[in-house]
């Protein structure tokens, strides 16, 4: 906080190699799992505005350093879990590319973009559906087949790719805002990559009796979370 205001563009350091260097200390504390907040390339310091699901943010490290951390942690009995933000991206992303910072044609830049149908535009390009109305977080269409392929395709999809890179699973941001069908496919993709993979969801209310967006959620049946 500076002057009582939240500074989402202030960065304070901390890297994957720094965590790896502290593994003996963490082991001595009795820690057996490290849950990382989002580490993918993003504009903000919190990184819940994903810019590229395939790349670790350079401020945190590299994809190779993530795998090295997971391998080193596993040797001392510690697992590493990633945070998945799959309900929305950042406006400053490969996929939306509001500011043209990425070489790809983003959905905001042209209707011929391969990512155009990932989003919902009411009046193109300025009026689009955003997570809780926050325009910096354009909401994804979770039912879009190409988006699902990007997420779940064996080996190459985001979900299995990062498990195969070393993550023990996923903690899902706003899981109760993800459709049940999407969650089932996500869990199946994770388990196909690693039968022991963990899929943990952020659900604010009683998960055994949860109704979200007019639908009773089946979190306790074992096929979503």
Predicted regions located by residue number:
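N-terminal structural segment of carbohydrate-active enzymes
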Residues: 1-82, 87-89, 94-98, 149
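Active-site oxyanion-binding pockets that recognize sulfate/phosphate
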Residues: 9, 141, 169-172
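Alpha-helical packing segments of well-folded alpha/beta enzyme cores
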Residues: 15, 19-22, 65, 69, ...
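Extracellular/periplasmic catalytic domains that process cell-envelope and extracellular macromolecules
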Residues: 27-29, 74, 109, 163-164, ...
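Aromatic- and acidic-residue-enriched segments that line the glycan-binding/catalytic groove
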Residues: 45-57, 86-129, 212-224
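Short amphipathic alpha-helical segments
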Residues: 49-54, 136-138, 168-170
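Active-site-proximal helices and loops of the catalytic beta/alpha 8
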Residues: 67-78, 87-88, 93-104, 158-160, ...
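Active-site-adjacent "subsite" loops/lids of carbohydrate-active enzymes
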Residues: 94-156, 160-165, 175
């Amino acid at each position: 906080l500076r002057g009582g205001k939240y500074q989402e563009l202030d960065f304070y350091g901390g890297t994957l190699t720094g965590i790896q260097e502290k593994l003996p200390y963490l082991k001595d504390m009795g820690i057996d799992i490290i849950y990382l907040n989002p580490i993918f390339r993003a504009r903000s310091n919190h990184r819940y505005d994903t810019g590229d699901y395939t790349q670790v943010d350079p401020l945190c490290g590299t994809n190779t350093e993530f795998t090295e951390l997971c391998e080193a942690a596993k040797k001392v009995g510690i697992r590493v879990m990633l945070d998945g933000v799959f309900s929305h991206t950042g406006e400053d992303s490969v996929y939306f590319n509001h500011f043209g910072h990425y070489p790809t044609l983003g959905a905001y830049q042209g209707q011929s973009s391969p990512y155009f149908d990932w989003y919902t535009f009411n009046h193109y390009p300025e009026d689009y559906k955003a997570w809780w109305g926050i325009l910096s977080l354009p909401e994804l269409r979770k039912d879009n087949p190409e988006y699902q392929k990007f997420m779940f395709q064996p080996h190459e999809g985001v979900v299995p790719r990062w498990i195969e890179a070393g993550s023990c699973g996923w903690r899902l941001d706003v899981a109760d805002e993800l459709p049940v069908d999407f969650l089932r496919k996500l869990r199946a993709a994770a388990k196909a990559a690693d039968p022991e993979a963990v899929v943990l969801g952020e659900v604010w209310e009683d998960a055994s009796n949860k109704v979200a967006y007019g639908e009773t959620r089946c979190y306790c049946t074992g096929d979503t979370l």
